[in-house]
Amino acid sequence: MRLALLSCLALAACAGTPDTRPINLPLAATPSPKAEIDIAGDGDVIALALSGGGARAASFSLGVLQQLRDTKDSTGGRLIDRVALVTAVSGGAITAAWFGQHGPDGLDGLRAAALDKDWQSQLHTTWMSPQNWERLMQGGLNGPDKLSTWLDRQVFNGAKMRDLNARPRIVINATDLYSGAPFAFEAPWFDAICSDLDAVRLSDAVAASMAVPVAFRPIVVRTYGRECPHQLAPWVAAAETSRSAPMLLRETARSFRFFRDSERMDYIHLTDGGVADNFGVSSIVTLRAASGTPHGPFTARDAVKLKRFTFFIVNAERNAEGDWPKRESGPDGPQLVEALLGVSVNAPKRAAADAFAGEMEKWERDVIAWRCSLTPERAASLGAPENWNCSNVDFRLDIIAFGDLTDKRFADLGKAATAVSLPKETIDTLIAGGREAIARNPEVLALTR
């Protein structure tokens, strides 16, 4: 009896031990190729940033992609075929990863694979359970078995980062919990830690992007700086010491230096990408810097071909709600926590969007200056046609949001919970809202003409 009891206690202790195994392997060969954007067609290019927001964001962004797939330009081509880049966070990362794995024609399968499944009921959510107190003390109510493993088995079927289609480029964003800097599953980050990006499971990347603090335990990444055969790229030191570089770029560069400091760091603990930037646009600024060129991450040939670059931020932000603004006493405890969580995500996201607007303007200026510095011979070798106008390129930034819709639709979509699962009728409404927002957007309409 005593032996049986001890055995049960031992098993319980083992069962309660958190799984903190790193998701990555050391770099086996040469560093990852540069994170370049490959454009197609005649130089009219679309990029998308898909925000976080759980199943609300995943569903709304799915509607956006479906409508782009079903919208044709003046030549009969699909607008979605112009999409060269998708950067995404949390709920938006599920949709982006699915799109990168299955392409435009496989988008409809996301509902059965993920959105229509009741994942929420499988999670540990109650604060009343002593077992959950222990889980919380270990770093989060839910571990990899409730996030990475579920995504791998139910959604992505064992796919790895190498299995994503080359185009569009999919950028999945998390947050380095130690530095607070963005961490993207892209070549510059994995070169900095001397790790094999291609071997990372797609589910682990998405899980890192979705790992909301407290609700989910951080995803662990190992740094391999001690064994690294190459130095940090020159742009890292330049960005870290620059007085004019965007703050998030400087912090990202500083985090890269931490990755190589074995006295300071052996493991990176990744949490929800929305903690640093719920739009995922900050990583694009890093990719720009890491390219080492005025036009990067566009290739030189694509930068010459480029005519119009339209960047859509898809914002599935929840509406502010509650009756406490009518009360002199203000919010109660739970309402205060909910409001603080919303502010903590929305404030840095809005700051990142404003900073990115300035970066888009600079990107356009840099591309024009570089193009106009080319000799006619060099421009021709890169594919420039006769009578090519080096300054004829237009960069545009727009935000797709619930506020673009009717008041009724805005209210319905904005009250959807931030949860990993939602009722099917709510998903229907969110997908329809994403479609409607694209169908009536002026920048999208301009792309059809």
Please place each PLM-identified region on the residue numbering.
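Sec-dependent bacterial lipoprotein signal peptides
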Residues: 1-14
